[in-house]
Amino acid sequence: MSYFEAFILALIQGLTEFLPISSSAHLILPSAIFGWADQGLAFDVAVHVGTLMAVVIYFRHEVITLFRALFASIFKGDRSKEAKLAWMIVIATIPACVFGLLMKDVIEVYLRSAYVIATTTIVFGLLLWWVDKNAKLVADEYQTGWKKAVFIGIAQALAMIPGTSRSGATITAALYLGFTREAAARFSFLMSIPIITLAGSYLGMKLVTSGEPVHVGFLLTGILTSFISAYICIHFFLKMISRMGMTPFVIYRLILGVGLFAFLLSA
C-alpha cells in the first residue's frame, strides 16, 4: 500500500460510511479497477477509529447526555426521554451482534461478491426511494419504543450483507416507521457508535493475534482522512436531507449499481 492508496481508501470510507450509498460498493472499485491489494487488518482498524471519532465528536453533546441518562437510569431509576433513547440504542444494537456472530462466515464466503454488491445497491436504493415517498414522516427519535428499536436493529443486522449500506438500511427502516428524515438520520448515526466500536474492537483483537505488521504512517493517514471526511459528510448530509430528501442518493445508488454490473459484464 502507498500513501496515495491509504488516502483514497480512507477518503472513500469516510465519505460513504454515513451516507445511504454503501461503503462496500465503493471500496471494491479501487481493487477492481486498479488492482490494489487488500488494505489489511491494521488499516481497517484505523478507518473504523477515524469514522467513530467523527460521529462521537459531531454528536458529543448528545452522546454525553445519553451516557449520563443511561447510568442514571441504572443507578437512580431515571426515566427521562434521554434515558429511554439510550436504552433503545442499546436494544437496536443487539440484532446486529447476534446476526454477526451467527452469519459472519456465511457472509464472507457466499455474499462478499461484486455481483451481490451491485444487486443490493440497486434493490435497497429502490426500497429507500419508495419508503421516502410514501411514509408519514412525523416522529422524532425520542418516540422510539422497543418494537421500533428492534425493527431498526434488524435492518442494521441485514446491512451486514455487502452493498446494503448500514446507514441506508437503518434510515429506510426509521422512515418506514414514521420518523422524519432528520430524526431517522440522527438515530442511525447514534446507533452507529456502539456497532462501529464493537466492529473496530473485534478487528483490533484480530490484529493483535495475527501478528500483522503495522505501518504507523498509513494508520495515521487512515485515521485522519476518514475522520475529516466523515465529519464533513455527517454535517452536510443532515443539512441536505431536510431540503432534498433521499432522491439524490437513490439516483446515485442506481447509477452505481448499473455501473458495477456494466463493469463486471464487460470484464
UniProtKB/Swiss-Prot annotation:
- Which gene is transcribed and translated to give this protein? uppP
Q: Does the keyword Disulfide bond apply?
A: no
HAMAP family referenced in this protein's UniProt entry, alphabetically: Undec_diphosphatase (MF_01006)
The record's subcellular location field reads: Cell inner membrane
Q: Which reaction does it catalyse?
A: di-trans,octa-cis-undecaprenyl diphosphate + H2O = di-trans,octa-cis-undecaprenyl phosphate + phosphate + H(+)
Name listed for the protein in its UniProt record: Undecaprenyl-diphosphatase
Q: What is the lineage of its organism?
A: Bacteria, Pseudomonadati, Pseudomonadota, Gammaproteobacteria, Vibrionales
- Keyword Ribosomal protein among UniProt keywords: no
Q: Which GO terms describe its biological process?
A: cell wall organization; peptidoglycan biosynthetic process; regulation of cell shape; response to antibiotic
* Residues that span the membrane, as ranges: 1-21, 39-59, 83-103, 111-131, 144-164, 189-209, 218-238, 245-265
Which domain of life does this protein belong to? Answer: Bacteria
Membrane association type: Multi-pass membrane protein
Other remarks on this protein = Bacitracin is thought to be involved in the inhibition of peptidoglycan synthesis by sequestering undecaprenyl diphosphate, thereby reducing the pool of lipid carrier available.
Return the GO cellular component terms, semicolon-separated: plasma membrane
Q: What does this protein do?
A: Catalyzes the dephosphorylation of undecaprenyl diphosphate (UPP). Confers resistance to bacitracin.
Q: What is its EC number?
A: 3.6.1.27
